[in-house]
């Protein structure tokens, strides 16, 4: 018999990277929130790599922070190394990456959760959903506790019917030998959800004392590290380096000789693995012309000797892993502390979701994170934040929030998932964003902080600082457009020292800054303004001026896209009644049920001719409706 254990506005199932963002956002918005987790000691656990950020992913962390989420704040307090990547390239692909101290990250996140006013945290295994009249009303745990809520968010990561694979060894488990969730997955199937099976893997961890670092290349952090969070004021300067080494022909021989022993290649593994984070077995088979592959040695924290062997994800037997490790320069005497393994798990086919991350089949039920077919902590956190905001909005009778593809990488990811689906673990890449010049590391706050403020996730004090920054940027651009720089000898000397061609005539400071050789500080030196502006404001002014033409073109593309997004598709549309649309397109449209013509145009199998017919049909319906009115 179940018992009523409490009533809430929002219940979050799981406390990984999606779960903590969901719970925190919902609670901050004023929703009475419950977060249930299998193990209170594993909140925000990092089961795989000890890092946050990187290309596209680092920008997602900035977006989370700009909206009022917490991943950026917590990693800023717990990193052992911080690096800005792609600094030699344009601002659209620059991204921050932090090496995390795993135990400290978890400790900081748990502290934040425990001290959030509207948030209750409980340890417990959720076995089934409470469904009444086709609407999700809560959850039931294995201890028969029934918790009721207006909205439920499931963020189970890789725990649903998780199975660990290593050679011929196979056993039910979540990451790091945690308990696995069986009944919740079965319950979702009972309610008609289409479930798929994915796989991910992790490499061995070795003892730092047994590594010969003299045979590797040092990878230090930045001298002046930047922050993920706009609220961080102090940086950690006591950084720990990572180290680079490589596989070789001997490593590849060991792997090739034992491929049939890998659960990846022996037929044991049924789940689809990640294309962009392949196992070492997969790399050797797919890229057999490559003589070597990079291996990064990444410390897992300040107070542990465990070192993560980035690049050697494997499901080979433990005995072969020892052999493989010892073939790598610097690791000849390395001792494995934890062996690598693959893990298979259940995921929900994401085309069953609305762009709010609420499920189409069960109103009131949301899903976020790896359960939706993604890979990576950052992708999970971004979805968790949006699911939390929308679940709270539903409970509090507020408008839902849907970020479009021009607003955020988070918007790109969610649109890809719910519109196109994915047949492998989805990873965010800069190439997935058609408007990536607008979705930069430096401007996440300008894109999203107004939204975070409107939904109650940004404090008044922070919003005041943000509006002042916006004003300073606009005022400085206006000021530079009014200042004329004449070609005096002093100015020509500055130009030559900067490697720029001499001025032929007087020019506005604004136009001069468009020259690639001239930074904001160089132009500022010419006009001797001595203004006290923050580095963030200077950076933003320079980028907006230098890339003005490209940004303008990108915004024109966005305007065209938004016209298609504004053409809403009626909820009761009958696709079978539309003459001329291809059969495959009708099937896909009925399955995805797009909200707009723009979303319909991005569905695989729906071609431009189908979109044109759909547009005409909708417009004719609108005309008929007006005539009848």
From Swiss-Prot:
Name of one Pfam family that matches: GIDA_C_1st
A Gene Ontology molecular function term of the record: flavin adenine dinucleotide binding
Localization, UniProt: Cytoplasm
Biological function: NAD-binding protein involved in the addition of a carboxymethylaminomethyl (cmnm) group at the wobble position (U34) of certain tRNAs, forming tRNA-cmnm(5)s(2)U34.
Keyword annotations of the record: Cytoplasm, FAD, Flavoprotein, NAD, tRNA processing
Subunit field text: Homodimer. Heterotetramer of two MnmE and two MnmG subunits.
One Gene Ontology biological process: tRNA wobble uridine modification
Transmembrane segments: none
Name of the coding gene: mnmG
Source organism per UniProt: Oceanobacillus iheyensis (strain DSM 14371 / CIP 107618 / JCM 11309 / KCTC 3954 / HTE831)
Positions contributing to NAD(+) binding: 273-287
UniProt family annotation: Belongs to the MnmG family.
Residues binding FAD, per UniProt: 14-19, 126, 181, 370
Protein name: tRNA uridine 5-carboxymethylaminomethyl modification enzyme MnmG
Main location: cytoplasm
Cellular component GO terms, alphabetical: cytosol
Requisite cofactors: FAD
């Amino acid at each position: 018999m179940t018992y009523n254990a409490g009533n809430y506005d929002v219940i979050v199932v799981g406390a990984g990277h999606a779960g903590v963002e969901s719970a925190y956002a919902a609670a901050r918005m004023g929703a009475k929130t419950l977060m249930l987790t299998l193990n209170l000691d594993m909140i925000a656990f990092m089961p795989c790599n000890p890092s946050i950020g990187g290309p596209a992913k680092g920008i997602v962390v900035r977006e989370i922070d700009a909206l009022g989420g917490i991943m950026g704040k917590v990693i800023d307090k717990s990193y052992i190394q911080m690096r800005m990547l792609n600094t030699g390239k344009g601002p659209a692909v620059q991204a921050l990456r932090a090496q995390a101290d795993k135990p400290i990250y978890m400790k900081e996140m748990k502290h934040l959760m425990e001290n959030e006013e509207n948030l209750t945290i409980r340890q417990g295994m959720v076995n089934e959903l409470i469904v009444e009249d086709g609407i999700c009303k809560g959850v039931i745990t294995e201890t028969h506790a029934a918790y009721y809520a207006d909205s439920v968010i499931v963020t189970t990561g890789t725990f649903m019917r998780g199975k660990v694979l290593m050679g011929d060894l196979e056993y039910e488990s979540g990451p790091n030998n945690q308990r696995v969730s069986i009944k919740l997955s079965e319950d979702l199937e009972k309610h008609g959800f289409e479930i798929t099976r994915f796989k991910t893997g992790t490499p061995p961890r070795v003892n730092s004392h047994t590594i010969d670092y003299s045979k590797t290349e040092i990878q230090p952090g930045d001298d002046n590290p930047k922050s993920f969070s706009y609220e961080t004021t102090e940086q950690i300067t006591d950084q720990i380096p990572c180290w680079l080494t490589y596989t070789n022909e001997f490593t590849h021989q060991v792997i090739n000789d034992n491929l049939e022993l890998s659960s990846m290649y022996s037929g044991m593994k049924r789940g689809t693995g990640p294309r962009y984070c392949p196992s070492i077995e997969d790399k050797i088979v797919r890229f057999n012309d490559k003589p070597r592959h990079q291996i990064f040695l990444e410390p897992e924290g300040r107070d542990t000797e465990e070192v993560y062997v980035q690049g050697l994800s494997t499901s080979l037997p433990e005995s072969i892993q020892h052999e493989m490790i010892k073939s790598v320069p610097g690791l000849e005497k390395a001792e494995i502390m934890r062996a690598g393994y693959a893990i298979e798990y259940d995921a929900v086919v994401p085309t069953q979701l609305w762009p709010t991350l609420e499920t189409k089949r069960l109103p009131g039920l949301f899903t976020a994170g790896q359960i939706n077919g993604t890979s990576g902590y950052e992708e999970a956190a971004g979805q968790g934040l949006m699911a939390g905001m929308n679940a709270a909005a539903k409970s509090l009778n507020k408008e839902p929030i849907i970020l479009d593809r021009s607003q955020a990488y988070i918007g790109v990811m969610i649109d890809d998932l719910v519109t196109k689906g994915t047949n492998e673990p989805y990873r965010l890449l800069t190439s997935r964003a058609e408007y990536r010049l607008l979705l930069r590391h430096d401007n996440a706050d300008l894109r999203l902080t107004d939204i975070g403020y409107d939904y109650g996730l940004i404090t008044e004090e922070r919003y005041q600082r943000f509006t002042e920054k916006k004003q300073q940027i606009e005022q400085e651009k206006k000021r530079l457009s009014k200042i004329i720089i004449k070609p005096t000898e002093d100015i020509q000397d500055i130009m030559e020292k900067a490697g720029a061609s001499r001025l032929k005539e007087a020019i506005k400071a604004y136009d001069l800054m468009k020259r690639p050789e001239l930074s904001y500080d160089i132009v500022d030196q010419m006009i001797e303004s001595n203004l006290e502006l923050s580095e963030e404001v200077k950076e933003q002014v320079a980028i907006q001026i230098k890339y003005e033409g490209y940004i303008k073109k990108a915004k024109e593309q966005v305007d065209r896209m938004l016209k298609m997004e504004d053409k809403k598709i009626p909820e009761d549309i009958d696709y079978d009644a539309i003459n001329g649309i291809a059969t495959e397109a009708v099937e896909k449209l009925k399955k995805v049920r797009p909200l707009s013509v723009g979303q319909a145009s991005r569905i695989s199998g729906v071609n431009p001719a189908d979109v044109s017919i759909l547009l005409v049909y909708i417009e004719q319906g609108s005309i008929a409706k007006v005539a009848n009115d």
